């Protein structure tokens, strides 16, 4: 697999173009500020009534309504929640984007599942940093960058890949390394990872472990520490150096228990469930479910969110985290502000 770095990208390609970033959330604020600091001409497209307008202005960015911002752009990067992109694209972007411009995304969901069918005259690319927006920005400010993916869906100009690399470089990505993929692969692997491992799998594993201990009469506080709190310590070791690095760092007792019990808990039945989840993603069945859920204002997701919030692990966790002020001091998300 080829990895692209600074030497492989021509930053001048993007410096000569007008770029519009639609959205100013986690990724939007990072892309807009990084590209501006790289010497690019950047406009942010937002709703004037939105809370992000003043934040973008305070950062010294040119901010306009989406339709106006798009009309002057050579490159339009849409950085909105998946469910909001089709409406904004068809109402504000497609009627106003210039002939032969470049349309860019940071996730392939809407293009891959045909919720957005870009005009035939456009270059369509993806530039997807593999990290949250605050990390994309902070690494850039340190002189580094977050590894990124690029992909080309339509190449009408013959230069779409070069433009994607140039954009990634301006965003700091070629400092960390850029890997080429395609919209299908990025979308399907991203959804699978979220559903089977990172969000769905991890959350259910933590809750089930907590419930098993408390149902057996153990203190909820002990169950929280053993099944949720310490998970970060293990994940950090894997994140830093892989599974072998984690096993090197833990006790022999913990490692032996991993080998004996891990395959009993996460077993062939789990693998079959993962394969079924992947099949739903590959066939578009999951996408249809998510789109229909959105059209009915997310009744199932809202109900499950309430159930999760009411789970005993949330109550005991809140009490225990109050005993650890360093957690609040270093919070990644402050729900009172964002």
Curated annotation (Swiss-Prot):
Q: Which residues form the KARI C-terminal knotted domain?
A: 182-327
Where does the record place the catalytic residues? 107
| Boundaries of every KARI N-terminal Rossmann domain copy | 1-181
| GO CC annotation | cytosol
Metabolic or biological pathway, per its Swiss-Prot or TrEMBL entry = Amino-acid biosynthesis; L-isoleucine biosynthesis; L-isoleucine from 2-oxobutanoate: step 2/4; Amino-acid biosynthesis; L-valine biosynthesis; L-valine from pyruvate: step 2/4
Record-listed Mg(2+) 2 binding positions: 190, 226, 230
HAMAP family of this UniProt entry?
Answer: IlvC
Task of the protein: Involved in the biosynthesis of branched-chain amino acids (BCAA). Catalyzes an alkyl-migration followed by a ketol-acid reduction of (S)-2-acetolactate (S2AL) to yield (R)-2,3-dihydroxy-isovalerate. In the isomerase reaction, S2AL is rearranged via a Mg-dependent methyl migration to produce 3-hydroxy-3-methyl-2-ketobutyrate (HMKB). In the reductase reaction, this 2-ketoacid undergoes a metal-dependent reduction by NADPH to yield (R)-2,3-dihydroxy-isovalerate.
- Stated name of the protein: Ketol-acid reductoisomerase (NADP(+))
The record lists the organism as Aromatoleum aromaticum (strain DSM 19018 / LMG 30748 / EbN1)
**Species lineage:** Bacteria, Pseudomonadati, Pseudomonadota, Betaproteobacteria, Rhodocyclales
Q: Which gene encodes it?
A: ilvC
